[in-house]
Amino acid sequence: NKLKDKNIKVLFVVNPNNPASIALSRDCKDNLISVVKEHNPELMIVTDDVYCTFVDNFNSLVSELPYNTLGVYSYSKYFGVTGWRLGTIFLNEKNIFNDLIKKLSPYMKNELNERYKHLCQNPAELSFMDRLVADSRQVALNHTAGLSTPQQVQMAFFSLFALIDTENNYKQLTKDICKSRKNLLFN
């Protein structure tokens, strides 16, 4: 019920949770959808879906509330390379983040235009995602934004590997190892 309060602007969700990899229930999702649609349509949701590969038939909040939700995913957990910090952010093209920027006061819009004026001729038209990328590398260094070449290559290899493994053998092996370790720890 707290999320019905329009003073609450953003919800951060780890789904599935860590370390148990338990996803939000259908009832919980339906309740959240109802709250957003009926009471707080400008609620921004950031969902950390890093552990989704460990949950069968996982369905992200991004697919349930695409307008309101920014998703975060990392290859690092699934492929056991946590030191690499390889991840991605995904956002629907039509989203609350862009629309809220358009609703800012003239003063705030001017501040943002001043911040991003070196990126393009019309900074008011920059999307939230473009601003996020620019801010990830400091606006002045935006021309170097993104991952380094070794990281890009590693993410490409991980993506290709996951596409080739059509029977999810690696995923099942990883889940079996996690279950085995849990049993060893608690039994």
Say what each PLM segment does.
Residues K2-K6, I33-L43, K94-K103, M129-D130, ...:
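Alpha-helix termini
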Residues K2-K6, I33-V35, N113, C120-A124, ...:
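Short amphipathic alpha-helices and their capping/turn segments at secondary-structure boundaries
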Residues A20-D27, D99-L104, N168-L173:
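Short, flexible/disordered intra-domain loops and linkers
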Residues I22-S25, V55-N59, T82-W84, K182-F186:
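A short acidic (Asp/Glu
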Residues C28-L32, L61, G71, L185:
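A general structural detector for well-ordered alpha-helical segments in enzyme core domains, enriched
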Residues P123-N187:
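Conserved PLP-dependent catalytic core of the aminotransferase class-I/II
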Residues N1-N57:
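Active-site phosphate-binding strand-loop segment of PLP-dependent enzymes
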Residues V62-A124:
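Active-site PLP attachment segment
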